[in-house]
Amino acid sequence: MTNLRKTHPLMKIINHSFIDLPAPSNISAWWNFGSLLGVCLGLQIVTGLFLAMHYTSDTMTAFSSVTHICRDVNYGWLIRYLHANGASMFFMCLFMHVGRGLYYGSYTFLETWNIGILLLFTVMATAFMGYVLPWGQMSFWGATVITNLLSAIPYIGINLVEWIWGGFSVDKATLTRFFAFHFILPFMVTALVMVHLLFLHETGSNNPSGISSDTDKIPFHPYFTIKDILGLAILMLFLMTLVLFMADLLGDPDNYTPANPPKTPPHIKPEWYFLFAYAILRSIPNKLGGVLALMLSILILAIIPMLHTSKQRSMSFRPLSQCLFWMLVANLLTLTWIGGQPVQHPFIIIGQTASILYFLNILILMPLTNIIENKMIKW
């Protein structure tokens, strides 16, 4: 009898995607993050659904409904902190997944890479809107500051901001629509993930060597399912340690104060995973220039395939490029630190220097280094 998983129309799709999928035999632990992101997305949708059952998207009751979830709902505190810290884990995995793509040259799969960038933008938008929902001080002022950046767009900026707000300030209409979008966007992310996987399975996975692995493939199950379960166990250990011992470590104390429009917090800052982009935004004194730099800091990923001048795909055998890659990582960590600091000396100059180095590294230093390495191969 023919195996059901190979003949049933639905099971066949799952089989080709997760069971009999031919995978390169040499892919390392850096290839775990795709499946971990899938787990994070599932966790966020499930915990978010349970939170939505008790949350009210009204400015008068939003803050107290979150308090009610934490105090009165059975395991409400656990669901809330799993959701909040799950977002942090999601972004940690996202950054490592993108970093892996940069290091091993996975961006040469253009469709997969571009869908990935679209996914990154969508997840960032979802996270931003989710941060507004508890309606604490940082929620309100974060929403005000970030949405107000759109007013820098010539001609239509102010009208666009008022249209997003649903009035002349961040208020009830803003909160209601942010909740609606925050609920629907994860399902759009899920659809995009399916397209991302569809394009990936057209070409097959990349591998650390960067060369074709068609001659040496092994089935995804059991080899990589077991490997991914180890990654999942480590992720859950980190997440549960955060949730059960340091639930508020990555949050902001100001968000435990209900939103108060007349009173501005001393330092307005977003969640930690947006701080690198926020630091780039703040490093430019001009408002429109800052907004453009903010957008370019993510959009720059889309032009990386065009900047690839090396004859080798992966950085595994390119030590100079490896140095620049780890400089870029250090740079992003510096920007993340600066984004959380007040706007004063010496943080201003450090932020400006790190921002210049970020763009300089990707746009000029990396392509030049690739050309030098090509010449070194001939020597």
Curated annotation (Swiss-Prot):
Oligomer and partners: The cytochrome bc1 complex contains 11 subunits: 3 respiratory subunits (MT-CYB, CYC1 and UQCRFS1), 2 core proteins (UQCRC1 and UQCRC2) and 6 low-molecular weight proteins (UQCRH/QCR6, UQCRB/QCR7, UQCRQ/QCR8, UQCR10/QCR9, UQCR11/QCR10 and a cleavage product of UQCRFS1). This cytochrome bc1 complex then forms a dimer.
Positions of a ubiquinone binding: H201
Coiled-coil parts of chain: none
Annotated positions binding heme b b562: H83, H182
Cofactor note: Binds 2 heme b groups non-covalently.
Pfam families: Cytochrom_B_C (PF00032), Cytochrome_B (PF00033)
Family: Belongs to the cytochrome b family.
Subcellular location, principal: mitochondrion
Obligatory cofactor(s): heme b
Gene Ontology biological process terms, A to Z: mitochondrial electron transport, ubiquinol to cytochrome c
GO MF term list: metal ion binding; ubiquinol-cytochrome-c reductase activity
Topology within the bilayer: Multi-pass membrane protein
Chain segments annotated as transmembrane: 33-53, 77-98, 113-133, 178-198, 226-246, 288-308, 320-340, 347-367
Record localization: Mitochondrion inner membrane
PROSITE patterns reported for this sequence: CYTB_CTER, CYTB_NTER
Designated name of the protein: Cytochrome b
Binding, heme b b566: H97, H196
Annotated InterPro entries: Cyt_b/b6_C (IPR005798), Cyt_b/b6_C_sf (IPR036150), Cyt_b/b6_N (IPR005797), Cytb/b6-like_sf (IPR027387), Cytochrome_b (IPR030689), Cytochrome_b_C_euk/bac (IPR048260), Cytochrome_b_N_euk/bac (IPR048259), Di-haem_cyt_TM (IPR016174)
